[in-house]
């Protein structure tokens, strides 16, 4: 199984659009980090709790969008390459070829999501925290931007920020499952990239203009946003502003895990049927 995952990784590295995405994503991350540091002027204006409050907002500022961009560009061809390179018939020649290939692609997707979130999170915490010497990093968190700190066990500012990236990882898997399903259905990289990237942009736009919409539109769209991958990526599915939805943080986590498992199951069903066609 390990060598199959390594083979998927080699395929991934061979895709030209992936390296373009890495370059653009790296520039976007550097821009986001530079903007955060230059605008906040951590060392001069704010106390330690306020500085960590700003660090908490980095996911909203650039983390979620950068994660979605790297997933939307990096994953579709991984599913479509056998069809586009006309090697799909070879997968079915082995007794368990389809099943093993699906497992390898799913496992690589999980590892890819983990790597993307870890790099973004580590860079954000190291650069932003280092800008003020990690002052108050181990002090108890005083408040949360996205979800109520009272719903969580006592933790430090640094642990709270790290936990946010754990929730971002959950949102990344949620979005990745959607990408796998779309790519398996369309079997075309460009179309999948357009549909998946466009879906995230619609969710992102709703997060900005949603409250201004008429109620008959806002209610169903808000439910779709909050229970979909958009709300999970942008952390609003955990928001303390909506206690009537989530009185405890385990509820959105449990829903997210359930949706991810459902997506991976649907991906297997669609993948198997398409490979037989």
Which residues fall in each region the model found?
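Hydrophobic transmembrane alpha-helix segments characteristic of membrane transport
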Residues: 85-89
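Alpha-helical transmembrane segments
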Residues: 19-28, 115, 259, 263
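Secretory targeting signals
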Residues: 26-82, 103-185, 205-207, 225-253
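Junction motif at the cytosolic side of a transmembrane helix
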Residues: 5-8, 181-185, 255-277
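Residues that define the loop-to-transmembrane-helix transition and helix capping
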Residues: 99, 189-190
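Central hydrophobic cores of alpha-helical transmembrane segments
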Residues: 21-28, 190-203, 221-222
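Short helix-to-coil transition segments within interhelical loops
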Residues: 92-98
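Aromatic- and glycine-rich beta-strand/loop motifs that create alpha-glucan
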Residues: 1-25, 105
């Amino acid at each position: 199984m390990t060598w199959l995952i390594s083979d998927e990784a080699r395929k991934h590295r061979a895709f030209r659009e992936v390296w373009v995405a890495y370059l653009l994503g790296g520039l976007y991350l550097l821009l986001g980090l530079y903007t955060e540091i230059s605008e906040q002027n951590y060392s001069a204006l704010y106390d330690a709790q306020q500085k960590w409050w700003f660090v908490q907002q980095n996911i909203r500022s650039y983390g979620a969008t950068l994660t979605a961009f790297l997933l939307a560009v990096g994953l579709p061809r991984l599913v479509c390459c056998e069809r586009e390179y006309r090697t799909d018939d070879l997968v079915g020649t082995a007794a368990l070829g389809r099943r093993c290939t699906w497992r390898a692609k799913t496992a690589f997707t999980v590892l890819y999501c983990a790597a993307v979130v870890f790099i973004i999170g580590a860079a954000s915490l190291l650069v932003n925290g280092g800008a003020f010497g990690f002052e108050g990093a181990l002090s108890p968190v005083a408040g949360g931007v996205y979800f109520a700190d009272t719903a969580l066990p006592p933790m430090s500012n640094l642990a709270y920020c790290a936990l946010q990236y754990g929730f971002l990882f959950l949102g990344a898997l949620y979005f990745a499952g959607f990408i796998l399903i779309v790519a398996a259905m369309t079997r075309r990289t460009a179309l999948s990239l357009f549909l998946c990237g466009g879906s995230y942009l619609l969710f992102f736009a709703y997060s900005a203009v949603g409250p201004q919409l008429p109620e008959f539109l806002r209610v169903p769209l808000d439910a779709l946003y909050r229970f979909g991958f958009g709300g999970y990526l942008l952390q609003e599915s955990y928001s303390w502003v909506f206690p009537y939805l989530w009185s405890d943080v385990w509820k959105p986590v449990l829903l997210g895990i359930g949706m991810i498992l459902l997506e991976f199951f649907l991906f297997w069903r669609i993948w198997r049927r398409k490979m037989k066609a």
